């Protein structure tokens, strides 16, 4: 999460250098998954804040307490920097109850979703013209070429496929052997 904060802070500085007209979204909704309960949600929060938007975060129900602790730290940092902590709000409500209302709300300009492709399609059906940044279900491949070190390739494939119990969005699910 700290790496995300540093990355997006530096990215925000570069917006000034670009000499382009930049109009931030007013409100960004962050809807993260359960499997990385701090890093992924905070990445979305920091990206939206760095771009000048207010943030609503609706964490996965399995990890609300993690999100609450992280958001308290964000509020403390914002206050220390002289920024209103109210720019970041956490919603703790049933997904079925809150999801459609939040996504389709007239003041929400954009949604950052890390989750299933079906969820992205559902969000799009609720608000077709919104900006949806969706990192969704994927099949990730590792390509092993003839010049690869075989022992290192096996170790990396094993780590990618089975590290984090296969619950990482970038976990390898396909190995392509070339040559």
Language-model segments: residues:
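Conserved small-residue-rich beta-alpha loop and adjacent elements
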Residues: 14-81, 130, 151
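General beta-strand structural signal in soluble alpha/beta enzymes
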Residues: 57, 90-92, 113-115, 132-135
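Residue-level signal for inorganic ion chemistry
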Residues: 52, 88, 111, 138, ...
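Long amphipathic alpha-helix in the N-terminal Rossmann-like dinucleotide-binding domain
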Residues: 1-15
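Short, surface-exposed connector motifs at secondary-structure boundaries
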Residues: 51-56, 82-85, 103-110
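A structured beta-alpha segment of the ubiquitous adenosine-cofactor-binding alpha/beta core
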Residues: 18, 89-112
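Generic hydrophobic/aromatic pocket-lining and core-packing "Φ" positions
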Residues: 45-46, 99, 120
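ALDH superfamily catalytic-core signature
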Residues: 73-82, 106, 116-179
């Amino acid at each position: 999460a700290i790496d995300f904060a540093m990355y997006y802070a530096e990215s925000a500085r570069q917006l000034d250098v670009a000499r382009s007209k930049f109009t931030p979204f007013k409100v960004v909704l962050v809807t993260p998954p359960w499997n990385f309960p701090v890093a992924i949600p905070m990445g979305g929060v920091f990206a939206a804040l760095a771009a000048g938007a207010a943030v609503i975060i609706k964490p996965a129900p399995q990890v609300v307490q993690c999100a609450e602790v992280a958001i308290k730290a964000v509020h403390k940092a914002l206050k220390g920097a002289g920024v209103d902590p109210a720019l970041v709000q956490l919603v703790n409500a049933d997904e079925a109850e809150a999801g459609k209302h939040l996504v389709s709300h007239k003041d929400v300009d954009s949604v950052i979703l890390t989750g299933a492709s079906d969820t992205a399609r559902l969000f799009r059906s609720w608000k077709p013209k919104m900006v949806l940044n969706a990192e969704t279900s994927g099949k990730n491949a590792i390509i092993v070429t003839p010049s690869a070190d075989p022992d290192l390739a096996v170790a990396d494939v094993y780590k990618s496929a089975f590290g984090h119990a296969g619950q990482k969005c970038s976990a390898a699910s396909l190995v392509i052997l070339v040559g």
